[in-house]
Amino acid sequence: MSEFPGLPQAPEYIQTLSPYVPGKPIEETRRELGLKRVVKLASNENPLGPSPRAIAAARSSLKDQHRYPDAGAYRLRHALARHHGASLSPSEFLLGNGSNEVIDLLIRTYARPGEAIATSQAAFVAYRICAQAHGVETLETPLTADLRFDLRALAEAVVRDPRVRLVFIANPNNPTGTHNTEAELRTFLSKVSQIHGRPVLVVLDYAYWEYVSAKDIPDPMKLYREFPNVVVLHTFSKVYGLAGFRVGYAIGSSELLSLCERIRMPFNLSAPALAAAEAALADRAFVRKAVQANRAGLRFWQRTLDRLKIPHWPSQGNFVLADVKRGLGLSGPEVFNLCLREGVIFRPVANYGLPDALRISVGTDAENRFGARALEKVAKGTQNGRR
């Protein structure tokens, strides 16, 4: 039955779709709670902001805003090809208004209504949202006990269900921060290279690749070169600090991505976004600075959580997942609301099937200390029997 009687009816898969819920905005929190200072450690943004070179490039482009941007993104495609090397062609890149658009384009191109994608529980919710928006089902396999993608179970699900057209694997995963090894991924890719007489498209989401320190996470370009059914996702929203510009991209075979290009809307990236992304890519010193700051921030939060006796998982991203239920006896949403009153926005992840956990993004040194004080105050309140 239509949600709005008397109006044209949308398909049921649209009517039942739960939209993406972003992290709570700073200004909204100030307004609702009457707080002067609010620190947001919720959306895995780069606390250093964009590279100064990216800001300058975007500002320089403003004088030409009466012109349409380059629909083919010639300069950025060539810059990306040089950046990733491995003799890549500019035609092996699909650019989108954030990775979300790229995910949407891949699903629209390679899955029909009634077919399916496969991923894991507690994976990036955009996979499921984009799939459902096009009448495509999402099959989710459980995480392992240590909150990693269970690639053995995922392979079995893909082999078992002939409707699966795409598989999404985030490495490392958000919101858990956990990762899968090269050996695990190679075994998985070998199993799904030909299923039911056809290859399944495997999308490796490497949004947090620049932050990775673990030695057993494979370079996605090696896997892309060896497995023609692999597509790799990257974003400028994380280490490059361009979340507000909305620039994401896929690396895949020219033949595969050319079909996505047919349905990509023209001018999907603004001229300032194109200019900022190209400049950010060239500023290697800024990226190194951001990675070093993130590692220091992760160490700070790991020490803080250890001191408060709140269990947490090793993270390869710019955030840490804390089991506040075991540590404080409160659910993730409960701790979120208590910290909100102290002016700190963390991220509850009950919508990922993790109601006992809270995701903490790394901020600046000052933001991290402010967030830690709020969490410590909540911890003391629980020890004293107060909620």
Kindly give the residue locations of the regions a language model identified:
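Conserved core of the PLP fold type I
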Residues: 63-195, 208-226, 231, 277
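Short acidic/glycine-enriched loop/turn segments that link adjacent beta-strands
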Residues: 73-76, 244, 316, 353-356
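A short linear hydrophobic-aromatic micro-motif
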Residues: 91, 232, 308-311, 343-349
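N-terminal small-domain helix-loop-helix segment of the aminotransferase-like
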Residues: 2-98, 105
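PLP-dependent enzyme catalytic core of the Aspartate aminotransferase-like
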Residues: 183, 193, 334, 338-342, ...
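Conserved PLP-binding catalytic core of the aspartate aminotransferase-like
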Residues: 143, 295, 307-342, 358, ...
